[in-house]
């Protein structure tokens, strides 16, 4: 009969493509609910890396995938996918998450932290000026007594 044709795309590859996305989603949800701060920097990075891995796996299906020019093209493709996905997901993250009510709480906390830092610096400068004033007020006078030699 004829020879068997190997499938170009193996369904087992989907496990390697989709499992990192699910793991990243669970990790980000865990971090979101366990920390008091909104970790918006991790979302674009994790999903950008996951999409980069997907493009790397999918680009292996090109014919003659190990040719020098095809490897260079795969490298450029992976970098472009990483950069575009990172910037697009970052923009979407900013639009969705930073407009939420929770982000306002975080922003108010950061502003409060800045005010506390400024107040503590002001208190330190007040203490320093007070200490300098007290130091300038005190005059140290030392009087040395001469010992009288006794003649016996």
UniProtKB/Swiss-Prot annotation:
GO cellular component, one term: plasma membrane
Keywords: Cell membrane, Membrane, Transmembrane, Transmembrane helix
Bilayer topology: Multi-pass membrane protein
Compartment list: Cell membrane
Record field: transmembrane: 13-33, 38-58, 69-89
NCBIfam families linked: MPN565
Record protein name field: Uncharacterized protein MG384.1 homolog
Native organism taxonomy: Bacteria, Bacillati, Mycoplasmatota, Mycoplasmoidales, Mycoplasmoidaceae
């Amino acid at each position: 009969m004829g020879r068997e044709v190997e499938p170009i795309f193996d369904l087992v590859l989907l496990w390697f493509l989709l499992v990192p996305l699910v793991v990243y989603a669970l990790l980000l949800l865990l971090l979101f609910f366990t920390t008091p701060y909104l970790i918006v920097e991790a979302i674009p990075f994790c999903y950008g890396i996951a999409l980069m891995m997907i493009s790397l796996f999918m680009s292996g299906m090109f014919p003659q995938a190990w040719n020098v020019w095809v490897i260079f093209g795969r490298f450029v493709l992976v970098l472009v996918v990483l950069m575009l996905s990172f910037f697009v997901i970052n923009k979407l993250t900013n639009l969705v998450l930073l407009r939420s009510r929770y982000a306002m709480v975080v922003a108010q906390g950061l502003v409060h932290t800045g005010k506390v830092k400024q107040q503590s610096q002001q208190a330190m400068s007040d203490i320093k000026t007070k200490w300098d004033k007290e130091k300038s007020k005190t005059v140290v006078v030392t009087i040395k007594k001469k010992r009288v030699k006794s003649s016996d």
